[in-house]
Structures are given as C-alpha cells and as structure tokens.
C-alpha cells in the first residue's frame, strides 16, 4: 500500500447524498429505523412506540442561545441508566489529559516520523497515544492531540468521552464507527466527529489503521464565519453527513469504557448500548470528506494567512480567538505573481500541531512524512526549510498546481505540552532544527 498517495473517493454516490446518511451541518435531523418509532408533535409521549424509552442527550445547557443550543431526543430499547453499572478505574495506557506536566522537555520546534503499526493486538481504547495537551480538561478549555494505532476491532466493547468531542483523522486504513446514532464509515481524507457522551465502538475495515485524533475539551466544532468571502467556498454545509438511525438488540455481555475527568473508567453490561431505534435533534456525530473543501487564495500577489483554510473551529469566549481551529492544506493552484509562495517565516501567539495524511507538504518537502507530526508552539519561530526557500525564491513563477497532498493543522490559543510518550518516542527527530541550518546570510547593503 502506498501511504503517500492520495486515495480515490470510495463509496460516494454519483448523485445525491451517500446512502445511509443525511446531508447538512447542525441541522435538526430526524430518522427512524422502524416505521412510526418517532413520536409526532411531541418529544416525550406517555408511551413511546415499540416499548421504547425516550431520552434526551444535551450537548449544551438548557438555556444556551437557540443558535448554540444542542440536544437530541433518542428513542431506545433501554435508557442509558441501564448502560451504567459499578465503574472501576481502567488503565489509561498512553492516553493523557490536560494539564499534563509529566515531562520537562526544553522548548523547541519538534517533528516526529510516523509511528510504526503495533505488532500486538490493540483496540482503539488501548491504541491512543497522546502527543500534546493544552488547557485544562476540568474547565472545558483546550485540547489534546493524539495518534491512534489500531490492529483489532472492538468486539463487545464500547466507549464514550465525557471530557470532550473527538475528531478522527484517518491516515492509513478505513474505520467503521458504530455509534448510538448510526454507522459512520471513514477513510483517509475524511474526518468524523463524535460529540461528548455519544457511545460508539471502532471497527477495522481492511486491516490495521493509523491516524490522528483531536480531543476538543472546549466549545463544539462549528463552521467558521466566511466574512467577505460570502456565501460559498471553504467547507459547505451540504457536504457534512450524519448517519441514519440503526440499532442492535443484542443481549450479550459487553464492556463500556468512559473517559471522565481525565481518567478512564470501565463497567460491564449484559447488553449492547447501541440500541437507539429512532432519534431527532441537532446533537449527533458526522463525517466530512476533506476533498470537497473549496479553497480560496491569492489570485494576484502575496501569500494569505492560513486561516483561509479553516474547515471547523471551536470558538472561545474571545471573538476571533479559537479554542481550536482545524485547518487543512489540500490540492490547490499557486498563481501569485512576484510572491514567495510557500508559507512565510512566522512567530505566532497560537500553537500549531500539524499532521500529513498523504503527499508532500510544500513548506517541508523533506523529513515530514505521511503519518508524521510537527509541533510549533506559541512564539517559537518556524517556516520553510532551505530546499523550499531556494526553490520558491529562484523558481519560475508560472501557475503550479499542488496535487496529491493533504496536510492539516490543529491550532489552539493554549501552549501545547508534550507528553512523556512524545518526548521519548523513537520517532522524534533529534535533528529537526537542522532543516534551517542551511539558511545563509544573504544581506548585501550594496545590492538593493
């Protein structure tokens, strides 16, 4: 398998919405797996159809403004109180939460190679490796950047995260996310977001899988404002897909893992918790194909700020200052005249964690491989390496299309603390800073 190559779009319908999904972002959806399972004109009937229980899942306070109010009504075989037992602490493995100060690593620009696939059997819960944490999970602010390495599907195991919503960014291998709300299938170049409190399990489709995982402790991801761009381009609402209802009526023992307060807890259940027969509301998991992102850019001169590539944003209480921005660098045309076209040299109040899904990143043609990661923390300088600088400074400025590439960035207002796993990993590149060593003094006061 060539992990550097851009994957083809698999399973997309030629017209209309992909079967098994509903189109739109933040819509008030309704879906039922059995006819008549959804009540009409009310949320909590005296007796729900099919002997179901009505239950509300709230992703925001009751009194949140209507535009930010998130909740769904679920009609399920058993209420969630039956999916809860005596919890005991479970081994967190390499999963960490903010604040995490377990390693006193000197400040530096950092980069990692792709981690190798595990040789032992590892499920999703066991396979999360935290790279950085930021903010504080207990104040619902900040994030964690993880890698996941999975070699075995979750069988009779389920999980939900009370600490934050999870964004899956596959890099190698397809995943099947079996959630309470329905089934989501994703592949490299797609993402999936699972809200807080939503139970799910992770299944492999075609062998071991590797990817990135963003844990958002703060406000839910939403679409960024377009401002003067107008009503179109960037990520369009219609390209987000939410699953239709499906359920399991399965009375076999299962384990339920819950991440709560930065710790992992487990309990045993006599049945599957994936038992929602119908639901309606706007608090639900979704997927998005990054290849449908419509980029905008400079069509005259200069290099615009990377914020024009924002797919989703988790806002903070300060307008224009994100808890997290999820930004991608997809295929696009470079046409600016008399311009240094790669990302410029930069020091930033925001902290940037980057990953590469496939292809080559234009500012780092060497050393930044698919499945790898980099960290440029707040106010630490970064920018193109010597090779990228020389090529961009001296090359012919004809229109060039960057093809077969997909990088992303998780940018947060908080400094990102490196975990012990990330600080001591064999994949950490000790010589990363050497990529700028070849940049020479070019100043000559006699030559304007």
From Swiss-Prot:
Cofactor(s), by name: Fe cation
Recorded name of the encoding gene: hmgA
InterPro entries membership: HgmA_C, HgmA_N, Homogentis_dOase, Homogentis_dOase_bac, RmlC-like_jellyroll, RmlC_Cupin_sf
Species annotation: Rhodopseudomonas palustris (strain BisB5)
Subunit description: Hexamer; dimer of trimers.
Function: Involved in the catabolism of homogentisate (2,5-dihydroxyphenylacetate or 2,5-OH-PhAc), a central intermediate in the degradation of phenylalanine and tyrosine. Catalyzes the oxidative ring cleavage of the aromatic ring of homogentisate to yield maleylacetoacetate.
Catalytic residue positions: 303 (proton acceptor)
Catalytic activity: homogentisate + O2 = 4-maleylacetoacetate + H(+)
Origin: domain of life: Bacteria
Gene Ontology, cellular component aspect: cytoplasm
Name recorded for this polypeptide: Homogentisate 1,2-dioxygenase
EC number(s) per entry: 1.13.11.5
Family annotation (CDD domains): cupin_HGO_N (cd07000)
Record carries keyword Aminoacyl-tRNA synthetase: no
Pathway(s) annotated for this protein in UniProt: Amino-acid degradation; L-phenylalanine degradation; acetoacetate and fumarate from L-phenylalanine: step 4/6
GO molecular-function term, one example from the UniProt record: homogentisate 1,2-dioxygenase activity
Matches recorded under HAMAP family: Homogentis_dioxygen
Gene Ontology biological-process entries: L-phenylalanine catabolic process; tyrosine catabolic process
Keywords noted in UniProt: Dioxygenase, Iron, Metal-binding, Oxidoreductase, Phenylalanine catabolism, Tyrosine catabolism
Positions that bind Fe cation: 346, 352, 382
Sites where the protein binds homogentisate: 361, 382
Record-stated family: Belongs to the homogentisate dioxygenase family.
Pfam family, one: HgmA_N
């Amino acid at each position: 398998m060539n992990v550097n190559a851009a994957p083809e779009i698999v399973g997309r319908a030629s017209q209309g919405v992909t079967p098994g999904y509903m189109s739109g972002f933040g819509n008030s959806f309704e879906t039922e797996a059995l006819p008549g399972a959804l009540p009409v004109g009310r949320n909590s009937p005296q007796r729900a159809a099919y002997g179901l229980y009505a239950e509300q899942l709230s992703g925001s306070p009751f009194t949140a403004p209507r535009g930010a109010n998130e909740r769904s009504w679920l009609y399920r075989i058993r209420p969630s109180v039956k999916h809860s037992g005596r919890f005991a602490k479970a081994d967190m493995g390499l999963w960490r939460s903010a604040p995490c100060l377990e390693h006193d690593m000197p400040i530096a620009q950092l980069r990692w190679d792709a981690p190798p696939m595990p040789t032992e059997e590892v499920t999703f819960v066991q396979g999360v490796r935290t790279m950085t944490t930021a903010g504080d999970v207990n104040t619902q602010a900040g994030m964690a950047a993880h890698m996941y390495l999975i070699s075995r599907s979750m069988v009779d195991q389920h999980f939900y995260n009370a600490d934050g919503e999870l964004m899956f960014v596959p890099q190698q291998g397809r995943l099947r996310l079996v959630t309470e709300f329905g089934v989501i299938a994703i592949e490299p170049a797609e993402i999936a977001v699972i809200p807080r409190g939503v139970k799910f399990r992770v299944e492999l489709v075609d062998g071991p899988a590797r990817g990135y995982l963003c844990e958002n402790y703060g406000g839910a991801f939403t679409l960024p404002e377009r401002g003067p761009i107008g009503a179109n381009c960037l990520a369009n609402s219609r390209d987000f897909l939410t699953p239709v209802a499906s359920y399991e009526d399965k009375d076999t023992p299962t384990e339920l893992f819950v991440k709560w307060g930065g710790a992992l807890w487990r309990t045993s259940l006599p049945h599957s918790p994936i038992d929602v027969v119908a639901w309606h509301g706007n608090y639900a998991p979704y997927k998005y194909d990054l290849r449908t992102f419509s980029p905008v850019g400079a069509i005259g001169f200069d290099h615009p700020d990377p914020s024009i590539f924002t797919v989703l944003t988790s806002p903070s209480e300060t307008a224009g200052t994100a808890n997290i921005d999820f930004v991608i660098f997809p295929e696009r045309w470079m046409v600016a005249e008399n311009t240094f076209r790669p990302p410029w040299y930069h020091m930033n109040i925001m902290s940037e964690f980057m990953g590469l899904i496939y292809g080559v990143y234009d500012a780092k043609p060497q050393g930044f491989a698919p499945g790898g990661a980099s960290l440029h923390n707040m106010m630490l300088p970064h920018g193109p390496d010597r090779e990228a600088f020389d090529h961009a400074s001296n090359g012919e400025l004809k229109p060039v299309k960057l093809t077969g590439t997909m990088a992303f960035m998780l940018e947060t207002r908080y400094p990102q603390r490196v975990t012990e796993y990330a600080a001591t990993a064999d994949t950490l590149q000790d010589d990363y800073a050497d990529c700028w060593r070849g940049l020479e003094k070019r100043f000559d006061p006699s030559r304007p």
